[in-house]
């Protein structure tokens, strides 16, 4: 077995959990010149994201589940988005601990948390693509038959979860806890003699069907949706779309940088661009930083709903009023002030 496929020969100090083994037969290990990121800053960041995500997404799910009468198709999608973020947030303490002592949690947790990370990403973009199609049909084609049949939305969401699981399944099957000599233990893919080739397949196929295709679907649908709104001068409907546009924008700002860096790393590993120690180090640092940005996404949607989503604020206050935590007079005043700007709620979202 050559040094490119034998885990004993890899320099794991240079590789993060998303890195790849070197592909060059004449490869010699590269050493990082400086620590990529202060691990304690990363740990504190993960802890804050965990707490905010746990609290925020739980509140989002609570508000949507309480509002059974006025629950829309978009609300069902956003409920599933919150569930995906909440499940991923539960893994953040494990990711944080691994930054200190390496991967000490064994193979099973290695598989599970890797699976949840990928499922969170893919389900997020697939659900957002479904929302874009729903808004496109409702606004551009004025189609209400599909959007009003909520039982169909449940099957669409199940399809998104199923596809996300399939796209993420290789991480569950092939990731293992491994403790190389003279290095901290890692959670890593072990694919046998053809590790480099199969890792290319495991990158290209999921990101094509789980990122690029849904991204183009969103760009197409929202492009025509915005065109229709501006052309028809639908000011109220445009304002009602603000939450959805904000959610999509935040998702792209958080996950697009990581995927672009991952693409650069893939091009380097396949020798499309020249590989060097300096380039490996730069890409490694960028992967670390952009992965944290992606993790941060799991706590941001509830913040968007709180600041932009009038229905979410009213639903939350309604729950508080039901339990005597705010007065019904205050709730009534809030309802009156928010009615004028949300009376035409084309997205029926938070």
From Swiss-Prot:
Glycan-carrying positions: 3, 16
Signal peptide positions (record): none
Listed Pfam families: 7tm_1
Extracellular topological segments: 1-39, 97-111, 175-199, 265-285
Cytoplasmic topological domain: 67-75, 134-154, 221-242, 309-350
UniProt keyword list: Cell membrane, Chemotaxis, Disulfide bond, G-protein coupled receptor, Glycoprotein, Membrane, Receptor, Transducer, Transmembrane, Transmembrane helix
InterPro entries: CCR1-9-like, Chemokine_CXCR1, Chemokine_CXCR_1/2, GPCR_Rhodpsn, GPCR_Rhodpsn_7TM
Topology term for the membrane: Multi-pass membrane protein
Entry-linked Gene3D superfamilies: Rhodopsin 7-helix transmembrane proteins
Statement: the UniProt record of this protein carries the keyword Glycoprotein: yes
Disulphide-bridged cysteine pairs: 110-187
Subcellular location: Cell membrane
Main location class: membrane
GO biological process assignments: calcium-mediated signaling; immune response; neutrophil chemotaxis; positive regulation of cytosolic calcium ion concentration
Membrane-spanning ranges: 40-66, 76-96, 112-133, 155-174, 200-220, 243-264, 286-308
A GO term, aspect molecular function: C-C chemokine receptor activity
PROSITE patterns linked to this entry: G_PROTEIN_RECEP_F1_1 (PS00237), G_PROTEIN_RECEP_F1_2 (PS50262)
Family: Belongs to the G-protein coupled receptor 1 family.
Biological function: Receptor to interleukin-8, which is a powerful neutrophils chemotactic factor. Binding of IL-8 to the receptor causes activation of neutrophils. This response is mediated via a G-protein that activates a phosphatidylinositol-calcium second messenger system.
Record text on subunit structure and interactions: Interacts with IL8. Interacts with GNAI2.
Protein name in UniProt: C-X-C chemokine receptor type 1
Gene that produces this protein: CXCR1
